[in-house]
Amino acid sequence: MKCVILGAGKIARGFVGHLLFLSKIPFAFVEKSDSLADMINERGQYTVNILGNPQKNCVVRGAKAIRFSDVEAVTDAIAEAEVVFTSVGGKNLKDLVPLLTEGIEKKSKTGGNLNVITCENWKLPATVLRNGVEETICEEAKEYFENHVGMTEAVIMRSGIEADKELLEMDPLIVNVQDFWEFPVDASRIVGELPPILGLKLIPEFTGFLERKFYTYNAANGTTSFVGALLGYEKIADAAHDERILKILDGVYMETAQALSKKHHFPLEEQLAFTLTSKKKLQDDTIVDFIERNARDPIRKLGKDDRLVGSARLVLEYGIRPDHLAIAIAAAMYYVSPGDEFAEKLVKMREEEGIDAILEKVCEQDPNGELGLLVKEKIALLKEWGWIHE
């Protein structure tokens, strides 16, 4: 098998697997859910629906999967591969380390380069994996690991959306995806050459590219999700058309654009043009994406390095006041979603310990620091507008 995809979720099937199939590159998924792995093997194919462009819809044939628990089969597949992709969610990256380590140890005996490409919406995912493997790999394979294994990162710009019930009844593996085909990968950490994969674009100055995507797309998504939830919206596209939300969103775009322009020396006009691609995606009515999915786990999304607080810290670093990001942070602190255990924990913390506790324990910010005071100012403003009721 030329490629292995660790994970078989919506992005794994609807983006990575889709592009590999169109590139005629053989691959196998590795999946933790036995039932999903078995279903992929039983059906042997799945449908990728391109939202808004149905003529590009595709049936991915010859789909195969290995159970995550079948360690020997997984590590054999890694040892035979040229490229391993990960699409498991950042929280699960450490679970991959033992499999990657053993697979690399096996591959060190047969030789050839191996590149591991993370497809995660997470901070420094390739570093997490490389550090984990470095700590556990056997002495005999260390030289091979250092010289023949690349661990690098991709930015995933395509969204994978749960299909509706009728489509899932016809094909339980079907994925609805955005009509976006570019697959940017950090060129600096690749060893040797990658196979020719449709859409793959090697980016030499990747740090700037990654931050540009994160602080533009993720900050905008967080803003739309949490402010949209506060105003009673269920769908991202509906919220992104509300003039009240758009005013805040445009402010967030300007704040992050100014900071990114200063940090990476992009022309401001170029960065503002890039924000339009983010807004277009959020407002795309063909992408039926729910706020509940995007706002899920608000405790993580209020973390100091995540989409809102992380963006606000970047903005402050470059001498810009993050007024609109502070509104988004304030909205996130008042997010309510019964059934979301982290949202329920956040509500409990807010009601029992107060906003200062969230700033301190969740956001890791001084409640009386510049950002902490600004967020509290915006909470008062949202109450004044009647958007927050206590």
Located regions from the model:
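Substrate/ligand-engaging "lid" and interaction regions
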Residues: M1-L6, K10-E390
